[in-house]
Amino acid sequence: MILMPKKKVKKFRGSRTFGWGSHKNRRGRGNRGGAGNAGVHKHKYIKFVKLAKKGEYLFGKHGFTRPKILRKDYLNVQAVKETLRWLKEEGKLDDYTYRYLYSRPELNAGDLDEIIDRLASLGLAEKEGDVYRIDLAELGYSKLLGSGKVTRKMEVKVFEATPKAVEKIEAAGGKVVAE
């Protein structure tokens, strides 16, 4: 009886991976040990050492992302400060008033009451009788807050004011005109 020669091709019937170790190893990308920076502190430690020497590898979290709402407030503060700087350069603000307003990113009704005389003398507010008229947009402020005491009658033109600020100004005999 003649024996058949042994087959050269073994088809691995019944085997899951057919002699290739893992199912991932037959997908055409080689045995890479993970994608990207996988294993840089383990089996690819030399890659980490080389990249770290060049300064190309950062591990962990870095930096800080400011929340968007704070960015908006920061931009508003910057706009106020730029407007105040411009008014000072034009000669419309004296040093005291400039420093007073520059140190306050938001304007309270009490602060406005303290400084309204100076603003009137500098031409940034008008005084008719005992009523002061001021447009806070000229100073760069878009909102009036309600802290402090209000003793003078003021007619304030502003984009937005808190209910407490409106209440205090109206209690002193003035009014708030919201644009």
From Swiss-Prot:
Pfam family, one: Ribosomal_L27A
Statement: the UniProt record of this protein carries the keyword RNA-binding: yes
Record key words, sorted: Ribonucleoprotein, Ribosomal protein, RNA-binding, rRNA-binding
GO biological process, one term: translation
GO CC entries: cytosolic large ribosomal subunit
Molecular functions (GO terms): rRNA binding; structural constituent of ribosome
Top-level taxon of origin: Archaea
Family: Belongs to the universal ribosomal protein uL15 family.
Role: Binds to the 23S rRNA.
Subunit and interaction comment: Part of the 50S ribosomal subunit.
UniProt cross-references to PANTHER family, sorted A to Z: 60S RIBOSOMAL PROTEIN L27A, LARGE RIBOSOMAL SUBUNIT PROTEIN UL15
Protein name per the record: Large ribosomal subunit protein uL15
